[in-house]
Amino acid sequence: MAKVSKRYKALAEKVEERKYSLAEACTTVRDLKSAKFDESVEIALNLNVDPRHADQMIRGAVVLPNGTGKTVRVAVFAKGVKLDEAKAAGADVVGNDDLAEAIQAGNINFDVLIATPDCMGIVGKVGRILGPKGLMPNPKTGTVTMDVTKAVNDAKGGQVTYRVDKKGNMQAAVGKVSFSAEAIKENVEAFVAAINKAKPSTAKGRYITNAAISLTMSPSIILDNMELMEIR
């Protein structure tokens, strides 16, 4: 642990205790690489919303222009022609009742689950398994849809989902440290633009109260929240 603490302290010394512009932060965060693997770049936001009110529950999905840097396995619940469309789009696993049986048996070898509306009854049978793993399809994240081709392409092409917690916090991976600073910046802008677009009309005061960017194993860099609120 002493070795980890020493490394973390050395990284922390590279980060000033102030708010960084997004461009500066995206350059600085790449200098915080310390792990032997390709660390994720993560953004954390605190929003001035009260998720106890349904209209202030911020939840959705956005496709990042430069992807996430991750290989995503996609499963699709569908029937008939939609099942064929899912296969053609590149889904890794497709099915309906047979897929539900596989999930019940513990075979969950996918990262994203998509379902057509007519299959949600089947999906519901394994909801207790999918829910805790964050895999339950939802219309708000575009994973309950008849357009399975678009859904699969989005999931494979860098889509990230977001959801505010009860304290107004949310976080998401927006790339890898191996990305260029500009690619990271473009991804953050796309993510924040989606969050700003989702701002409830009932939200009062400063919408983004705090924001930070970091690597998987690095200290956080505080972002200028006022700059972020101007991103569209």
Curated annotation (Swiss-Prot):
Binds directly to 23S rRNA. The L1 stalk is quite mobile in the ribosome, and is involved in E site tRNA release. Belongs to the universal ribosomal protein uL1 family. One of its GO terms (cellular component) is cytosolic large ribosomal subunit. It comes from the Bacteria. This is Large ribosomal subunit protein uL1. SUPFAM superfamilies: Ribosomal protein L1. The keyword Ribosomal protein applies. Part of the 50S ribosomal subunit. Keywords: Repressor, Ribonucleoprotein, Ribosomal protein, RNA-binding, rRNA-binding, Translation regulation, tRNA-binding.
